[in-house]
């Protein structure tokens, strides 16, 4: 099938997948550092020295060398390339179906972003579980497919969907908030900027602002999700993780890893949306 005659949703999928590839490769180290920071909570007792982002970063370089920062990039690719594609194609389809006559309002933008993320999140959750375990450093899998086989044999297929509720509680609000802020701030741009050669830079800046706010608001759900997926034998329910984190580390425990996650999610989302919109414009489709 030639690209020029492909269905618009297929084109949106391809543009989204390409944008996801670029952003994932660039910002994978931040995701690894975020995961290590969050999973360190299990082994750090209250009152001990604080382990920060720089400490984890240096430790990875010392023990696993430079390429260690890209540990887990294979499952990240397996997740993000189709995952981002599914997200953008779903978003495009929903927007064309319900808002083809005009731009969605703030609440409608939230529903669009959250709905598209839920669809992509459910489809890609098994790979998300494997990616999180790869990055944690606690598991020694031979590869993505070896990890899938190992989990199914030792824990059952159900383990591949561990943290589903926490993942949706994190990703759906993040995407909804992000799309709402991103779309509304873009509308505030004057025409001389939004219609000029500086539009990609301006759009990226809007994406950064939206990403920071959305990341901070959804950080607690990300911490809970990571604990469930890394230690499914210890935490069987979301409420168990919430009680554990609060008891051992207080409210601050829910924001462990916030800096690297905010950096990564913000930069990845801003880049993915900017690249996606530029690619869609190049092929004559309104994103």
UniProtKB/Swiss-Prot annotation:
Solcar repeats: 7-97, 104-188, 198-282
Record field: catalytic activity: glycine(in) = glycine(out)
Pfam family, any one: Mito_carr
GO molecular function: glycine transmembrane transporter activity
Upper lineage: Eukaryota, Metazoa, Chordata, Craniata, Vertebrata
Entries under SUPFAM superfamilies matching the protein: Mitochondrial carrier (SSF103506)
Localization per record: Mitochondrion inner membrane
Chain's role: Mitochondrial glycine transporter that imports glycine into the mitochondrial matrix. Plays an important role in providing glycine for the first enzymatic step in heme biosynthesis, the condensation of glycine with succinyl-CoA to produce 5-aminolevulinate (ALA) in the mitochondrial matrix. Required during erythropoiesis. May play a role as pro-apoptotic protein that induces caspase-dependent apoptosis.
The name this protein goes by in its record: Mitochondrial glycine transporter A
Gene Ontology cellular component terms for the protein in this record: mitochondrial inner membrane; mitochondrion
Alphabetical UniProt keywords: Membrane, Mitochondrion, Mitochondrion inner membrane, Repeat, Transmembrane, Transmembrane helix, Transport
Gene3D superfamilies: Mitochondrial carrier domain
Classification via InterPro entries: Hem25/SLC25A38, Mit_carrier, Mitochondrial_sb/sol_carrier, Mt_carrier_dom_sf
Its membrane topology: Multi-pass membrane protein
GO biological process: erythrocyte differentiation; glycine import into mitochondrion; hemoglobin biosynthetic process; hemoglobin metabolic process
Annotated tissue distribution: At 24 hours post-fertilization, expressed predominantly in posterior blood island, posterior cardinal vein and circulating blood, as well as in somites, brain and retina. At 34 hours post-fertilization, becomes restricted to posterior blood island and circulating blood.
Similarity section: Belongs to the mitochondrial carrier (TC 2.A.29) family. SLC25A38 subfamily.
Signal peptide (residue range): none
Disruption phenotype: Fishes lacking both slc25a38a and slc25a38b display anemia.
TM helices/strands, residue ranges: 13-38, 72-98, 110-135, 163-186, 202-228, 257-275
Principal location: mitochondrion
